[in-house]
Structures are given as C-alpha cells and as structure tokens.
From Swiss-Prot:
Gene symbol of the encoding locus: rplQ
Domain of life: Bacteria
GO biological process: translation
HAMAP family: Ribosomal_bL17
Designated name of the protein: Large ribosomal subunit protein bL17
Amino acid sequence: MRHRKSGRKFNRTSAHRKSMFRNMAASLVEHELIKTTVPKAKELRRVAEPLITLAKSDSVANRRLAFSRLRSRDAVTKLFEEIGPRYKDRPGGYLRILKCGLRPGDSAPMAFVELVDRPVVEAEGDNEE
C-alpha cells in the first residue's frame, strides 16, 4: 500500500534527486525564473518555498540552514538580502507555475517557475520617445 508516501521519485536515486532540486532551487533564486517539466516544478515548490520563509528572518543560523540546503553562497546572499525582505508581508505562496506547452523531443509538459512579485525587466528594443 502507498499510504502516507509523499513526493515523486523521478526514476532517480535519492542523492541524484537531492542534487537536482538543490541545483534547481539555487537557479530559481539566482534567476527568479526557470523552465522545467510540470512534475519537477510542482516538486520544486516543496524545496524552494520553505527557503524563502527561512529568508524572511535574517540570522546567522538561518543563513547556515539555507546554505546547507542550497550549497551556493551567491544564492544564499541574494535570498537573504533581496528575496527575503521582498516577501516580508506575504504568508506563503511565493512561486507561480505557468504551463508553457510540450517539449518537442518527448512531449513532456513544460512549465515556467517564477517568483510571484519579481521585478519585470523591460525589453530594450522598439522604444520610441
């Protein structure tokens, strides 16, 4: 029976899965938008959202906990100096998953994962003043 077994295995070993989500979470923190498959995006929420909640209160202990989960100094710095203060008043739901069609090679459903209140960068072309 499958009672109370949460999480997906993705046909990977536990170390590979842990490494994959560690890398994806660090990329999400650094770029604030990544493209991945829908099941990986849904599973990434379980890794990334607690990190942002941790970053809302800046302390040495919280930074060390975040570093133990991300293993990227740049990502931890950005998480605590930019992203944590941005979501100070939001009680959760920091990520948005936008479906974006199928991957050409194997028709896997793809999605963008983005931070909810990320700053929008204007395109530099076609600016007429």
